[in-house]
């Protein structure tokens, strides 16, 4: 039972009554009806790759839940060539959906490092983002239909995928990002995209976050002027401490001629000739044209979570700020963390293109939240969000007020009460 009750960070976890692994929507409905009748909490769980405690029970307080594992609901339907859509079981992994789409001549718009363990249901429940948000948007932008079981065991099925359907509330959009607090997502209908063409990937050293943003802006201009029809697909950022850590843990060498405070990863759809990159002789960069070399460059970014996990218990702060304020906020966060003795190791990496920073802190005990709160309060001062793509979970439930007004929180609580009047769906997540 251990894999179901402790999350990836090793910071969150607690007891449960049982772990059940239903194989159908009907079985899930029966479980929810039984739990509702007995007043027992329910915790839906996908691949348990969450980083904010939303996919595991609380350590203490309240009645232990029944964990509903979705890992048997793995069916992926045939790709509808006419609409460019497919219906996917909640337990299928992101990687399985990606490969299924590619075999049919399509691609799915969401991608992230945990693709082979994160489930589709989990990515929908958290409205996952990943590396291609600038091109395709968050998970919510991919979802065109949903099937879910509500707290009382009733089943809602809306999987037609019609793009024009204004008959009432958009329940798919509501359940996307709800973190298991409104119901159990069992299947989704998602839109697919045609392949974009050959890409070029580059790691580029810059002196600051301001320079990183300027470089990203120039990449967009270069794509438009040098390679008509091309586009910026991804823009990632990795600071020097994070680069050093991943090099040490993953046995990678520093990829550039010089050391830089910030390294930017750009992926551009440009026919694979590098014409979409803003490069000249003054830039310290390494460029990859074939897929093997591109995967090697992506490893510096995608193995960051592994690197910080090897360093100890990680406090992971997934935040976002408006792009015009990102550089100032990042600089202030680095200066702030340098003053905190408990923050023995820290760094920033993330999705530059959409203002999403992953602030990683190793050193504080699992329940020592002083550094966490300092980071979240700093982000709030810049008008940012305390959760960019990982969800609120248990980790940030008490901090929701930092970026949501009292009126907004009251409205969300009202929705929660309407769909889950007994408060049995993932209690303690999203709201404290």
Where are these regions (language model features)?
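N-terminal flexible segment immediately upstream of the FAD-binding catalytic core
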Residues: 1-33, 50-84, 113, 242-253, ...
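N-terminal accessory segments
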Residues: 1-8, 15, 38-40, 281-294, ...
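Feature of Fe-S/electron-transfer and energy-metabolism proteins
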Residues: 2-4, 20-21, 26, 34-37, ...
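Conserved, mostly hydrophobic/aromatic
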Residues: 35, 180, 420
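Residue-level signal for inorganic ion chemistry
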Residues: 35, 48, 91, 153, ...
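FAD-binding subdomain of flavoenzyme oxidoreductases
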Residues: 75-82, 86-231, 236, 424-426
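Activity-critical C-terminal alpha-helical subdomain
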Residues: 154, 397-432
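C-terminal substrate-recognition/cap domain of FAD-linked oxidoreductases
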Residues: 190-193, 200-206, 213-374, 378, ...
């Amino acid at each position: 039972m251990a894999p179901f009750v402790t999350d990836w960070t090793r910071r969150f976890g607690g007891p449960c009554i049982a772990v059940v692994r239903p194989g159908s929507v009907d079985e899930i409905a029966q479980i929810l009806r039984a739990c509702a009748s007995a007043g027992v909490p329910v915790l839906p769980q996908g691949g348990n790759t969450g980083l904010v405690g939303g996919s595991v029970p609380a350590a203490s307080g309240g009645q232990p839940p029944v964990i509903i594992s979705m890992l048997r609901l793995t069916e992926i339907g045939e790709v509808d060539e006419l609409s460019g859509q497919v219906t996917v079981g909640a337990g299928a992994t992101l990687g399985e959906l990606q490969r299924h789409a590619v075999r049919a001549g399509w691609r799915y718009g969401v991608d992230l490092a945990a693709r082979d363990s994160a489930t589709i249901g989990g990515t929908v429940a958290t409205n996952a983002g990943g590396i291609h948000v600038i091109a395709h948007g968050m998970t919510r932008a991919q979802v065109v239909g949903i099937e879910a079981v509500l707290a009382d065991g009733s089943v809602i099925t809306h999987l037609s995928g019609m793009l024009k359907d204004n008959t009432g509330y958009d329940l798919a959009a509501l359940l996307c990002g709800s973190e298991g607090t409104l119901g159990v997502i069992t299947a989704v209908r998602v839109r697919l995209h045609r392949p974009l063409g050959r890409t070029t990937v580059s790691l580029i050293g810059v002196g600051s976050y301001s320079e990183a943003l300027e470089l990203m802006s120039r990449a967009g201009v270069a794509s438009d002027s040098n390679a008509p029809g091309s586009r910026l697909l991804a823009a990632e950022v990795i600071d020097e401490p994070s680069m050093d850590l991943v090099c040490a843990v993953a046995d990678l060498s520093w990829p550039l001629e010089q050391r830089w405070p910030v390294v930017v990863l750009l992926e551009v759809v440009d026919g694979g000739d590098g014409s979409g990159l803003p490069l000249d002789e003054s830039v310290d960069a390494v460029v990859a044209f074939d897929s093997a070399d591109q995967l090697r460059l992506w490893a510096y970014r995608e193995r960051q979570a592994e690197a910080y996990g090897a360093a100890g218990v990680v406090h992971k702060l997934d935040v976002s700020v408006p792009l015009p304020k990102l550089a100032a906020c990042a600089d202030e966060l680095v200066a702030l963390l340098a003053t905190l003795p408990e923050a023995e190791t820290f760094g920033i990496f993330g999705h530059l293109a959409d203002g999403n920073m992953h602030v990683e802190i190793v050193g504080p005990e699992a329940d020592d939240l002083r550094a966490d709160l300092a980071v979240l309060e700093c982000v709030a001062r810049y008008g940012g969000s305390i959760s960019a793509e990982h969800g609120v979970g248990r980790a940030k439930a008490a901090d929701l007020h930092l970026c949501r007004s009292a009126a907004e929180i009251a409205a969300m609580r009202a929705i929660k009460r309407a769909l889950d009047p007994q408060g049995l769906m993932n209690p303690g997540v999203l709201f404290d």
